Amino acid sequence: MRKEYDKLVRDRIPEIIRQDGRQCDVEVMPEDEYVQALKDKLVEEAQEAAAAGPEDLVKELADLYEVVDVLMDACGIDREIVVAKQKERRQSRGGFDQRLRLLWAD
């Protein structure tokens, strides 16, 4: 039974589908659609990581890292700049080490 997806998939997914004896069709996205599809995939993978149990969390975080890496490459963002910004924000706003939950503020 044919199922429509219309979403970004990993490069080997069509090959894996065909090896399973099924058919599929793909197209290469233009750059602007590709970047948006990566952003959509980032949300999808973050939701999957948030919903994952302990046994699947590492796999889902690996998928999330993959999308972040590819999105940075697609947007020409240097990893060192992101790490520097992470350190800057951690210093100015703190990390999450204290496990604080904000209950209210005036």
Set out the residue ranges of the language-model regions.
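Flexible "arm" and connector segments at domain edges
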Residues: 1-106
